[in-house]
């Protein structure tokens, strides 16, 4: 199972670095920062499906 350590999030701004992750909502997130901010917003219901685009 793929996991991402989201401790230290949310962050107020994310870089434009493109290292895509696919969330359990079947949405592609551009990088770990964008994904982890969304995880925090979802109150932990969003998880990582896999690395790379959905």
UniProtKB/Swiss-Prot annotation:
Superkingdom assignment: Eukaryota
Main localization (coarse): secreted
GO MF: serine-type endopeptidase inhibitor activity
Start and end residues of each Kazal-like domain: 4-54
Entry's localization field: Secreted
Glycosylation sites: 43
UniProt site (Reactive bond 3): 16-17
Disulphide linkage map: 6-36, 14-33, 22-54
Cross-referenced InterPro entries: Bifunctional_prot_inhibitor (IPR051597), Kazal_dom (IPR002350), Kazal_dom_sf (IPR036058), Prot_inh_Kazal-m (IPR001239)
GO CC, any one term: extracellular region
Keywords: Disulfide bond, Glycoprotein, Protease inhibitor, Repeat, Secreted, Serine protease inhibitor
PANTHER family, alphabetized: OVOMUCOID-LIKE-RELATED (PTHR47729:SF1), SERINE PEPTIDASE INHIBITOR, KAZAL TYPE 2, TANDEM DUPLICATE 1-RELATED (PTHR47729)
Domain notes: Avian ovomucoid consists of three homologous, tandem Kazal family inhibitory domains.
The name this protein goes by in its record: Ovomucoid
């Amino acid at each position: 199972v793929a996991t991402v350590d989201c401790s230290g999030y949310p962050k107020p701004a994310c870089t434009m670095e493109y290292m895509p992750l696919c969330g359990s909502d079947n949405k592609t997130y551009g990088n770990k920062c964008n994904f982890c901010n969304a995880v925090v917003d979802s109150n932990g219901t969003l998880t990582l499906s896999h690395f790379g685009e959905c």
